[in-house]
Amino acid sequence: MRIRPWTPLSEQGSVGRPSFVADHELWDDDRLAAADRVEAELAHVDLVRLVFGDPHGLARSKTLTADAFRAVLRNGMNFSPGPFLFDTGHAVAVDFLGDDPGVGVDELVGAGNFVAVPDPLTFQILPDRAPRTAWVLADEYLRDGTPHPLSSRGVLRRVLAEYESRGLAPAVGLEVEWYLTRRLDDEPGNTGNGFGLQGQAPRVAAMNAGYQFNLDAQYDTIAPLTDPLALRLLELGLPLRSMEHESGPGQVETTFSPMTALDAADAMLLFRTVTKQFCAARGHHASFMSHPALDSADPSGWHLNQSVIERATGRNLFEAEGPSGSMSPEGKAYADSLLDWARDLFMLSVPTVNGYRRLAAHHTLAPTRIGWRVEDRSAMLRIVGTGAGAHIENRVGEPCANPYLNIAAQLFAGLQGLAGGAAGDAPAPGELLVPQSLRQSLEAFRAGRAAQLLGTPLTACLTKLKESEVSRYETWCAQNSSRPDRTTQWEQREYFGAY
């Protein structure tokens, strides 16, 4: 068979912006060295997924050929800003076609491109993929080379720079609950969907009856999926610690050993993405939606464990002498500051309408009050461990939260306490309850101090995204009858498939 010899022009000027990384000095020495190693690895790769986390914590990507990625590695790749502008249901929440999108980013006018620059330290070849595929995370930049003000990963990197300047390094551990279900059909869910309206949620069946917490026999019913998934996660280098069966039917908890904060956020994005892909390829559906509309579902949470290490000595700042659960003065200052900032930043830990169902009083193991206690799972902050293992577990998060923003919010708030920042007034008794709806949380976010962490543009953008989401939900509720104690059809369509 004769094959026409197509003659491509140079890729160097056809993707991204030539010499973008070098011209703007975007990489440190570690990344420059890693980029050379990545170029060598491309000989063993067919395709590369260039990925960034959107404001909702979902992985957005372009799949490039290995040859194209050689240029992208140092030029960056042009991306549409759409993922910054759509809410969870793909409704346009930021008016990018008007003269002023209203978030303070001029480059959004007309939906102009931004530049996604691969972080060569995150490059890895995915196991058992044909064609041979690599995954690499990107940092987002404006076209003039400045960090994109709507970048979630950029927010976390700024917070970590503050810790580094003080000789400190946060350590973060992940405990993530999610649902494993069996798909009943292969319908794509495109009936009646569009901008601002998600299609039908996946039709699924439960894996077991549930409600035998940690029962070994129940784990056996999910082990044909979770055991090979565990091996896949280990092949990816993730520091997996355990797979456990929780209370709900097919409800899984996956835990990881402590990591650096940026590694933890990157790991969470990769873990959720790979888990959904792995299960889908085997006729199952994994969902990180907190409270899916499944018979007898128990809501899922994301417990975020955190401590702070002094770089020079390796000392855990939270460590104190005394009985189990005691905390050092630094640890108490960190915890108190988390409480002081809790309402302002709560929406970053529980960002969906559905996530607040878990925080209702009748879910006894979910936190309902803003407070901290030693070894008490009803509190927002649970103080755990002693000595070098002393840490704070924040129990309010939902599993689908944006990992960069959730982790950044915790570390930023805690740092204000470590730095001796003035705390706000103690909450009045009626304010000790955690927010009970996304609307409540959004109003606290809108009126609060979030811009000190996020900057004005991202604060404005998230406000628009969440206002669009909650308004669509409220409109649906006004037009449809539903029980307030039940997950609605709107929530199931909005979150169960995508998350």
Region locations from a protein language model:
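ATP/Mg2+-dependent ligation/transfer catalytic cores
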Residues: 2-240, 433-499
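Active-site capping/gating regions of soluble enzymes
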Residues: 23-25, 32-41, 46-164, 168, ...
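Core alpha/beta catalytic barrel or barrel-like domain that forms the active/cofactor pocket
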Residues: 171-179, 197-216, 236-256, 286-307, ...
